[in-house]
Amino acid sequence: MHCVLAVGGIHLGHCLRDDHDVTAKTWFHYGKAIERLKFYLSRWKVAKPDDLLRLLISTVLLQDFEAIRGNVDGEVFQHLRASRQIASALFNSTLNNDTEIMGVALEAYCYRELISAFRLGVEEADIQQVLNSFVIDLSCLQHLPTFGSCFWYCSFLFMQIPLISQLAGRRQRELREGVDMCCDVEYTHLYNKISSWRPPGQEFSANCEVDIEDSEAVSAMIVRISLLLFLVTSFYHKSITPHELCKITQPWVTEALSLLQFAHGSPTIIALFWPMIVIGSYAREVSDQSVLQRMLSTSTHKMPIVAKGLVLLECLWRS
């Protein structure tokens, strides 16, 4: 309950900036949640499956708290690390995992775990944790009645994120040490998998790659573009000039912004925050930057993380 109240409070507090009572109560509940969580985490190995589920829900909610707040001190990753063994133990437990709450908790954890690798410089130990867990094969969760609440039908794309992060680390070692690590082969393999992916059941014409009336399909294609941008950067980072990289990525930026016009205002737009930040970091045309600036500044999702994302992009655009 303390976790729920803290999450509600941090969102409300951003809308009511001068309400010190809301802020004080929010941090009171957050402090209590952390206090209780530390106590139960020290005993999680002997916890029953029902208690493991409560622990996982608590850590996921605290990740939400820090994410909404803007992940100011990187605390999302601390809560994520606390979730890993609990989620794995819960997944392998005898608890009936067909229940809705179980499905939502496990999928929410997997979503955050995969999204956390959507960046350069991820620690190798964190990548290996994901690659050696059930998270890397989301098909094991597809029997759950709630599956798709976080991933829609593009779980395949999300599963490529840690593989790209792993390639990024290996590619930097390859460039630094001058030893062939077959990164070009892995890059080509990932590029072909991601670029050829399309939303299931979509009818394509010569002029349109996706049904613009299907907001989930449009959003999935935007996620696909953000992964291609991430992949290209992971491979070419420090081996070509920024200008050369932008020449490669500009067609994808143009396509993504076109699709964002159709996704803007749809229920799936909230899940496109990180893809929008990734796409925005490659936007070099003032007109493209203006489109993203308008979308983020007029977003109906009034949260600190959205405001901080826009500030980050504006800093990149000025540099």
Language model regions located:
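Short acidic-hydrophobic sequence patches enriched in Asp/Glu that either
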Residues: D21-K25, H29, E75-A82, I101, ...
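Cytosolic regulatory protein-protein interaction regions
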Residues: L16-V22, G121-S297, H301, L313
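Acidic, Ser/Thr-rich low-complexity linear motifs
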Residues: T94-I101, S215, A307-L312
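C-terminal, low-complexity intrinsically disordered regions in eukaryotic proteins
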Residues: T300-S319
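Start-of-helix signal in alpha-solenoid helical-repeat scaffolds, especially tetratricopeptide repeats
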Residues: H2, L56, M102-G103, E107, ...
